[in-house]
Amino acid sequence: MNTYIKIDEHGNMLFTENKQEGINSLIDNKQENRNLFIEKNKCDKIDYLISIVCGVIGGAIDVFLVGAPGNSKLGKWTDKQIDNVVMKFSKLNGWNPQEQNKNNVKSAIEYLEKKFKVNYDQSVSNSASAIGLTPNNHHMKSLAHSPDIIGLFFSILNQFTSTSTFLSDGRLITMDTYNQSLQGHNFISKLFCGVYNWIGHLMSDFAGSSSSKGRGKGLVMPFYELFNLCNFGKFNINDKKGTMADVAIKAFENGYDARFGITMAIPVVMTNLLIKLIWSLRRLIQFKAPIRECIPTSKHSDLRLMLLIGNGTLCFVDAMDATIRSGGNFL
């Protein structure tokens, strides 16, 4: 006796001894078959192809439009947007420039530097020189200049205790500074003023210094300062050997700051958006899935795999380009 598959109105597979009934059930329940296929969340060859193509597109954007700081087409656009943000923030805090300085970001930065002074902003002194602190790397080594929770903690600590805290050569170093009088009548108000002072000072450094030539040295990417702890390894840096911390510092000095970090994120965002868009359209148009099942969320294992493949392809293209450009140097 032969057994045939039958699918009921709910899309469940049953077994029947009637061959014609099983065949008719399969024919009459095409939508249930589609739903069964979708619910399995398995990638097919088209999904793999989509992921790879999207990754290559992201890689091409990275190679031809991102490039390196200083000659990046997307980087110039990103820098301009950051300049606009800094000028808008300055206006919100009282910057009222003359007509000739309305679009002058240096004027806006100078205003913020004067308004949001901090005690830990020294970059040149005898003590600073002893730990290798320079105007080019003090945003990297000074923990209070980091745009993350670590930076906030050390900024409040330094403002309340009149100190500066640095990471250098794998060591945590604290220096005494001049006394800074925080505004506010009690601890809570002083804490609030300290937080806002930190934000304002970060904005004054976001687009570089008012005295710097060119784009200047901005802020580090969030948690990038922790590379200062990596005082190990031997890597080629312009015909010299250096630790991982030295590589990170040199990269920051060469323009890999938070602004360029935003630029480098654009190919990643584009790759993810393309994969999610095509994945959603395919489910909606080809598989006739309900709209709620076409929303790209992490619960879909096939989408997670597609994103992994797409980003892996992007990283591979980027790594190949970096290897060719570097010629064996890490920078």
Per-region residue spans from a language model:
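Glycine-rich, hydrophobic membrane-spanning regions of integral membrane proteins that mediate transport
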Residues: 1-331
